[in-house]
Regions:
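Interfaces that engage single-stranded nucleic acids at replication/repair/recombination sites
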Residues: 11-18, 134-152, 156-178
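Generic recognition of cysteine residues
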Residues: 20, 36, 74, 78, ...
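Conserved inter-motif catalytic segment of the P-loop NTP-binding fold
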Residues: 1-67
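Phosphate-binding/switch region of NTP-binding enzymes
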Residues: 67-151
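Generic low-polarity alpha-helical segments
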Residues: 26-29, 80, 178
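Short, surface-exposed, polar/charged, turn-prone segments marking secondary-structure boundaries
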Residues: 29-31, 55-58, 106-107, 145-148, ...
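Glycine-rich anion-binding surface patch
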Residues: 6, 58-59, 81, 167-170
């Protein structure tokens, strides 16, 4: 375990990923990347000058952090907090308030960068809101178990053994595959 302390800036996370890689770790779990986004929002709020222009000081730091996750030699699992809200659901003829997660506390569309995104509800059941592996797409909610982890690991290992594609050598310059 490599514990981070405040401030939770992107550079600290980037360094931590490097330390984990150097230590030979195969899997890194970052709990949570929402702390980094909160730091960047506070950083932005405290900058002087034009708020819109100040995003130019924030975005490269966020992008470097996400790229470091994506380019890691390790498997990286990230957690994110979600904004909470209550909804009323009918149960046995009564309206019961239930807490629901709405959106990840991170930059908009960050989920695009990940292979699988599980939304975990208050009962600790997961639903894949995004799944490039197609292992969990369209499935009803389920508990995250060791078996789920093994399915993901098997998928990762199958992808590792696929032959690499050498882009740009299959077709002469200027020609497009039909």
């Amino acid at each position: 375990v490599l514990s981070l302390s405040e401030p939770y800036n992107p550079e600290k996370y980037i360094d931590a990923i490097g330390i984990c890689e150097s230590a030979g770790m195969e899997v890194i779990i970052i709990d949570s990347i929402s702390h980094c986004w909160d730091y960047l929002l506070d950083f932005h709020a405290n900058l002087q000058g034009n708020s819109f222009a100040n995003w130019a000081k924030v975005t490269p730091r966020q992008n470097a952090f996400i790229q470091r996750i994506l380019n890691s030699s390790c498997h990286v699992i990230c957690t994110m907090r979600s904004k909470q809200e209550y909804v009323l659901n009918e149960r046995n003829g009564k309206m019961i308030p239930e807490k629901v997660g709405l959106k990840a506390v991170q930059r908009d569309n960050v989920d695009y960068e990940f292979t699988i995104v599980f939304d975990v509800n208050m009962k600790h059941y997961a639903l894949a809101s995004k799944d490039r592996t197609e292992l969990f797409a369209g499935k009803a909610e389920f508990p995250l178990t060791e078996q789920v982890g093994m399915q993901i690991l098997d998928w990762c290992n199958q992808c590792r053994t696929q032959p690499s594609v050498n882009y740009g050598t299959s077709y002469p310059a200027g020609r497009v595959a039909q």
